[in-house]
């Protein structure tokens, strides 16, 4: 160890001359109550007042969260800083204190809101306020606690981490108990309860891990090291481990009533000696070895103290302890002699078991420096007197060995209640006294006789008392006897004491219990254990077998004991005691030797207590049984939805493994069977959304902005999210076809599912006609109305469930009409989250329903026949127009005279083919899709061939001035007809482009333009030298006709009318067109849309803005002119300019002539 002269850094603040001032590196830090005082008070509070309600909330405020300021929080940090000699950096320190201050302020608001609500629990405003305050408090703690575990400072921050963790668990318990009365839905409450049980383990494991890390860090070889080691162990047991050991009691479903816990761990005051410093090299291991190894708890009855003398000084040389087992259930036993049996004075017997035991010692120390000659050349460090004070409500006199002293044990282990005298408010009582000694002969350098006082928490009662109105936890270290093969081992740090261990079958232990309730009172037993093997527990009372049950392994062999290694299990069969004083026996059987079984405690629970776990089991059993049509689980009830099965599965998953593991497994298998039956009757492919657009002809198809998300509090499995769209002609969509082969003739089918929230969600079922609903489901925080109880934890209001029926007439596999299932959103504010979709057989059609579907089917067939007749005519005309564009049936070359207007005219005739796509969603092919796509593909080829002949890039200026060289000022403007045109407003401006050509080939330069005002507009083509030609444009009013101008102003308009020319956007196609239906109220009343099949074609309003409708005619006044040009080199230049006024150019084309 480093012998730093600045030794005050290792001195605990509560051992200084002024307990109100702490010293750290020369700083003076003013404090109020010490962290140990506060922690002892908190532990007492948790042991005695662990009942949820305003009393508990306000108690936490009074003890810590309402009285602490920055200096008090800083004291918690200083405490561990001094022990481990590590200073927290200023930033981390200030951040931690600021967070603690914020939590304190927020919790005071929470506590006041809780108090007001408890006084008026039905007040809606106060209920809402509690929901707000809980959410704020939970969010703040969730954010803050990781900051108390910041890297490199986990140990110095450990005590404040535990304080914040304790607060968080208390708040989560509040919502688990009172959340429904505050207005939270069952799903939220269950989720927060799951957080509670998970965080109990997480917070516990963090605290124990870093406690052990800090303890290892302060260990050293010398006595001074041991002093610091023991101080760390003692103080962090009080400020960390004791509090952590009570965390499991926050589980409100396992401990729904008052629960009494006991702390049986022991802590040790430092050896009461002067000059007990680092001069005793190598003595740390010896001092630690003088402490008792793990053992059963016993009751200290008396101490017989022996006295010896040295150089005329009398001192405590040795002693013998007499003790009794817990409950005084056996004969008194005597421990071996500690120290030596001195005879310099008569032995003195201190009776320790008076009142509530010895709570305080006041010791006198004796230190004599060595002389230089003979026997006197020795150092003497001993105890020459001690006063033993009894804890009692009366003035019971103390017992004194020789004399009282000034070394007060309360300086190291303060009372837990400073509002009463220490004899009443003490926190610990003396449990044992051992001795560290050194120097056994006259040749020894020093003589040390150091009594080692062990202390146990006062909650560890002398008897094992079982009342009728509370859950009683009894650590098994309070057993009377251990079974052969059972041992006591050191506890893992979070059990509040040591634990028992067995590695072979047999009796674990027996303990004496005293029943204060009437013997008619019935109880259930629970066991907290950890095991590497499956095993069977047996219990008996006074030799009478009571319970026997099989329980599973909780950990793997060789793993460390952690919070999650332990499980609390119970027997369902209640029992009663026959005698007021009985012997309870616990045994473990049916496992192979060599495995490890650890037992922490047993619990006696009044049988009248209705546990949440029992209620959950009954509710889950009822919910599972109601899924099926009969008790043998052959079939599902028709009205049982897939979503409902998932919620029942959630209910089963939430059952306690500790309380009903076997029943949980059985119910889980039944629910899985129900899920399989649900999947079998569901005609949808991939109902769980494993993917969209994975296969061309199977499963779900959808737009690219749909997302698949995993399960959450609402959905157990995958669900989809549909977002709004900025263009109603490009909706968000999801669809699937039910194959004809899956359908039965004259049967009604139902589409149903669950919507978490939606706006403007349109749902379609399409066969002979379109069934359509628009569904708006508000996404409120509560999915279950407050006025109605939720039958299942995560089930929601029925309005979140939707269903839509469709009737099927006769079926025809060749026709393969099937049923289209479509979900669509076409508004900007629209959205939806939905899942658990089903399409299933509902019932055969009879009576009026049968007649109605036959009538609808006949109308549909009549309409289909008429459509086929019309289609034959339209197809013939369209095909002729398309064929006329090409030179042959291979469709690989255009006719020499084919121009853009002819292609547009043919395209328009192709688009006159009806029912190419469903008007409800134009990405779904209709009955004429094949012939339409055949002709549309040739139109696309025609456009491609035509584009290949035009060697000018961006000749229509749709990409602005890209590819053009510009001099002066020009603009590209979008006209009212949505066409982009080049505007040359000044005579000095010029636009040009260099074009590569094939020398010796012929080209046609074609320009469509309009001239405003006087002057001429010119489009010139030329090479480097000569070979120049141009097209000139003037205002049509002048009626000038130029050479080579083959079309006049009026001619162009006439050409447009002749071909009805419109332009198709080849990039967009028709994959977004659909019917625009007005929204209907979400009353779920289905209606046939028969007139869509009787009144003619279902119009698609987006069609005028899509496909060929994108090409709009030019206004009157535009002129198209062309000339022939034969380049002599491989480059030509196209130049655009004007002499006066404004020149407007729609397009420039340079077309390669056919050979």
UniProtKB/Swiss-Prot annotation:
It comes from the Bacteria. Keywords: Sporulation, Toxin, Virulence. It holds the Pfam family Cry1Ac_dom-VII. Gene3D superfamilies: Galactose-binding domain-like (2.60.120.260), Pesticidal crystal protein, central domain (2.100.10.10), Pesticidal crystal protein, N-terminal domain (1.20.190.10). InterPro entries: Cry1Ac-like_dom-VII, Cry_V, Galactose-bd-like_sf, Pest_crys, Pest_crys_Cry1Aa_dom-IV, Pest_crys_dom-III, Pest_crys_dom_I, Pest_crys_N_sf. The keyword Transcription does not apply. Coiled coil: none annotated. Toxic segment of the protein is located in the N-terminus. Promotes colloidosmotic lysis by binding to the midgut epithelial cells of many lepidopteran larvae. Belongs to the delta endotoxin family. This is Pesticidal crystal protein Cry1Ab. It comes from Bacillus thuringiensis subsp. aizawai.
